[in-house]
Amino acid sequence: MNEICDTAVCMPDVQSSADTRQIAIDKVGIKSIRHPVRVADKADGVQHTIANFNMYVFLPHNFKGTHMSRFIEILNTREREISVENFEGMLRQMVERLEAESGYIEMTFPYFINKSAPVSGVQSMLDYEVTFVGAIENGQYTHTTKVVVPVTSLCPCSKKISEYGAHNQRSHVTVTAKTRGFLWIEDLVRKVEDQASCELFGLLKRPDEKYVTERAYDNPKFVEDIVRDVAAAMNAEPLIDAYVVEAENFESIHNHSAYALIEHDKRKK
């Protein structure tokens, strides 16, 4: 036996040893590792971006630890081929490789949409934070898409009581949707932006700035209005089985935010 083999034999595998505390671990793995990915782009076919991965598996009570290096190996063997289409396959590979009952992968990445200004038509990119969450439990795969959409909100009360003007601010609407099939990121973003006082743009000329200012003023909404209107849009989408809608207004006249949340599972009557 050569020296390398002798060394390997002599090195104890501590993580594979038994644990006597009789306590299982729901999720164990790695967090915050970045890797290049490909994402389906409705306009251009594919978009290359960098994702931040969290990867976990279930660990039975009788095992001391999991094989942390195997998570990295799964990412590295796929090089640049990670995409939405093979997301489930990668998750199943992870569960099989680590001999786990259940597994979870969270993939968070910036996604860019090319938008045209409302009057001038000048184009610019706007970024959105997107997270894909895949889970395998009892052999069943589920997929969840989470999108953070920045929008403008304008206060109806401020408009009503003021002789001119109204306070407005940037807001974040977060939709976490459990889907039964493929849903374009762009379509989910559009469903949110349509319910805001006004959507955001990366670049605006003066005629565009006038338009978005007046658009928001003519379409005032409380944080409660936004979550209800977005929830109604989620209810109307047949590809969405369940969702959580959150809205946070970064109040321009306060040092705190306004917040609202609606959670609904359409499969439950």
UniProtKB/Swiss-Prot annotation:
Protein name according to UniProt: GTP cyclohydrolase FolE2
Gene that specifies this protein: folE2
UniProt xrefs under InterPro entries: GTP_cyclohydrolase_FolE2 (IPR022838), GTP_cyclohydrolase_FolE2/MptA (IPR003801)
Keywords: Hydrolase
HAMAP family recorded: GTP_cyclohydrol_B (MF_01527_B)
Job of this protein: Converts GTP to 7,8-dihydroneopterin triphosphate.
EC number: 3.5.4.16
UniProt pathway: Cofactor biosynthesis; 7,8-dihydroneopterin triphosphate biosynthesis; 7,8-dihydroneopterin triphosphate from GTP: step 1/1
GO biological process terms, semicolon-separated: tetrahydrofolate biosynthetic process
Highest rank taxon of the organism: Bacteria
Record field: catalytic activity: GTP + H2O = 7,8-dihydroneopterin 3'-triphosphate + formate + H(+)
GO molecular function: GTP cyclohydrolase I activity
May be catalytically important (site feature) positions: 155
PANTHER family found in the cross-reference section: GTP CYCLOHYDROLASE MPTA (PTHR36445:SF1)
Main EC class the enzyme belongs to: hydrolase
Family: Belongs to the GTP cyclohydrolase IV family.
